[in-house]
Amino acid sequence: MSTKVKKCREPARVTLPAPEEEEDGEAEGGESQRRRRGWRGVNGGLEPPCPRAPPSPGPDASSEGSPSRWRTAGMRDKGRRQAVRGPAFMFGARGPSLTAEEERFLDAAEYGNIPVVRKMLEESRTLNVNCVDYMGQNALQLAVGNEHLEVTELLLKKENLARIGDALLLAISKGYVRIVEAILGHPGFAASRRLTLSPCEQELRDDDFYAYDEDGTRFSPDITPIILAAHCHKYEVVHLLLLKGARIERPHDYFCRCSDCAEKQRLDAFSHSRSRINAYKGLASPAYLSLSSEDPVLTALELSNELAKLANIEKEFKNDYRKLSMQCKDFVVGVLDLCRDSEEVEAILNGDLESAEPLERHGHKASLSRVKLAIKYEVKKFVAHPNCQQQLLTIWYENLSGLREQTIAIKCLVVLVVALGLPFLAIGYWIAPCSRLGKILRSPFMKFVAHAASFIIFLGLLVFNASDRFEGITTLPNITVIDYPKQIFRVKTTQFTWTEMLIMVWVLGMMWSECKELWLEGPREYIVQLWNVLDFGMLSIFIAAFTARFLAFLQATKAQQYVDSHVQESDLSEVTLPPEVQYFTYARDKWLPSDPQIISEGLYAIAVVLSFSRIAYILPANESFGPLQISLGRTVKDIFKFMVLFIMVFLAFMIGMFILYSYYLGAKVNPAFTTVEESFKTLFWSIFGLSEVTSVVLKYDHKFIENIGYVLYGIYNVTMVVVLLNMLIAMINSSYQEIEDDSDVEWKFARSKLWLSYFDDGKTLPPPFSLVPSPKSFVYFIMRITNFSKCRRRRLQKDLELGMGNSKSRLNLFTQSNSRVFESHSFNSILNQPTRYQQIMKRLIKRYVLKAQVDKENDEVNEGELKEIKQDISSLRYELLEDKSQATEELAILIHKLSEKLNPSVLRCE
């Protein structure tokens, strides 16, 4: 970096201000001005400083040619000198001595004395326009910092003006739009990529264009003008810079290993991370999102998700990234809040041209791509916004407009009718899918009711299947009951009842629906939704249970076939059967633990529990139960987090107590802690107060072991019951309070997720009716085959036309070329016209920018306005004084001329 600092050979001469300056009020505090301008604190502050030359770069720096290393070494040496000289010389040793002319020039630039600045720039030949004060600021920086537009314009006309980039950054940070326009008009910004390169990159290329002083830049070296404007939310400045071609480059992926990222990471990892955050701050700024993107809503949603991921990756900057992610989400909500009609709401929620048209005209459903994306990225305030909810509610009651205004009793009656008449409705839909009945059944609300009714019937079958055992069973585990003497007992126990057959049909129907959903969404999107994982797990367990039951039935049937073909006696108790056949005649108490029927019954019980837990899936549809279901889900997450610490403590005490008492098997009051299994049981049930204190007592007089057992058992109970369980209760209470504080948003977000699962085409008929293909499915299948064959024919025809193209005449080619040119021009004219979605988005962004500007004006501090008025008055004062001096001179000349005419004789004598 060029320092522009020369070594002082002799003290500069002190020059007092001229009398005219005293008349103008500049003599006030002249001595303090000289001290402020870089005069050393010696002899009353009248001795000029003698700055030292900058340190010469070492051989390493010269060999590598790295200005940043040279600057780092120079700053290190300067820091040592300042530490030696003390804080009184913090700034005194940096700037060169100023002449009286330069000091007057800097004062005039700082206080907006336009006449003096203009006069000195036009008349003085010795003036250095790049002279700096004790803080290292030149006249341009002082004028911009005090918002003197006229002075800035005068200075920008001078050639070889330094630090124009820093003046631009200063004007942007203070929001001086007119000064920014003036600076951007300077020829210095005509250079290629002047606005896109960061100050650090610019410094490595040529000069100190963005430098504040010889020590570096005013802001972070990676801050470009447009990044700074975006940070400060200056909409007008961002617009100006975008028109000049400035853009914010999106940082590379965090795990990017390109040469550029690797080099930056190696040189300074902290600066690299800060530069990424500064870039993301600019990208996430509402000003930049509004003015730079063709689809600000989509850009903000994707950027919020990217920032949320970075918050989990870069833990050290977690709060910064989360704040930026929330800023993007608030921007999307702010744009949605400015919608004034359904067309604008539909445009934002759908995000394409087709959805921007009224739905009734086209007769197709909205895609709701932006809503799905917001749900995926958990932009809850956007989904729960009244404008979005009103549109979703309209789609929810599609083709059922009258039902929306009905009471809850009427809606419950509709649900009951649908549940009872579900088979007949399914038959009607199979016969006439495009009739009025078919349209009603395709309504999202009716699909939800049909699926809910089908699942309730499924749960009813599960209950009814166990109803014969509600009051107990007559057949004890050690008793066998058969229908005839030669019957194998297991044949009777493994037979499927009609309710179990219906349950199997329902399970197959639900499995078919899950497979179709998995095919349409893909494995990754399918697994993301936990309810899908629960459904798939539940159905898999059901299938495993029925498979094990079927295997047991096959084995029992084979045994029965053996008896029927080989045994002639009528009573099996009098016959000696092979062991593999005899086993199937035993009562339940003699079955093996690995028996397929026992495994089937255990899996079936687990599947039933999961089936009833799936009722929570439909609870968000109700305003009363929805928040409770959300709190329950959050509680389950807290329990899983708690289990990590719980298992660690539990295993430590379980192994320790087992090691302590494993040698005393049979020598204790009870078998607690003598085996790993007993240790687990004792410690687990002690959490609920169901274990005895005598679990650590020995029959022998080994008090040392017994006392250690008492101590460990007591510490375990205090740790688990008093500390960890209360910690879990506090976590659950905190999670519930978070849901309760924002219950409306959480509930509407969960309800919207439920609604969207029924908005897409398909899933009209619930299981098990979905197993039977409708005639509409065959029609769609035939249409797909037809379209595929047509596309193939078109490809063949196109290939033939391309092959025959060489045999065409020149006249035909000329005609075709003209027609193609005309078509291309017309097509381009169509492309240049903004789409309906772009027009709507333009209106919304314009409202957003206007609202942001109004809010900013209302939030501005009065001190800033008073300072601006004070500076304007100061500039006006100098102009009035200049006008006064000019008027005085003109009056003196006029009086002199009059005196010459009136007294010619006196003049001759003189």
UniProtKB/Swiss-Prot annotation:
The reactions it catalyses are: Ca(2+)(in) = Ca(2+)(out)
Q: Which residues cross the membrane?
A: 449-466, 498-516, 530-551, 596-619, 639-662, 703-728
Residue numbers binding Ca(2+) 1: E147, D872
Residue ranges in the Extracellular topological domain are 467-497, 552-595, 663-702
List the InterPro entries.
Ankyrin_rpt, Ankyrin_rpt-contain_sf, Ion_trans_dom, TRP_dom, TRPC3_channel, TRPC_channel
Name the residue ranges with Low complexity bias: 59-68
List residue spans for each ANK repeat.
100-129, 135-164, 166-192, 221-250, 623-652
Tissue-level expression: Abundantly expressed in brain. Concentrated in cerebellar Purkinje cells and sparsely localized in cerebellar granule lyer, pontine nuclei and thalamus. Lower levels detected in other tissues.
Function as written in the Swiss-Prot or TrEMBL entry = Forms a receptor-activated non-selective calcium permeant cation channel. May be operated by a phosphatidylinositol second messenger system activated by receptor tyrosine kinases or G-protein coupled receptors.
Q: Member of which family? A: Belongs to the transient receptor (TC 1.A.4) family. STrpC subfamily. TRPC3 sub-subfamily.
Q: What is this protein called?
A: Short transient receptor potential channel 3
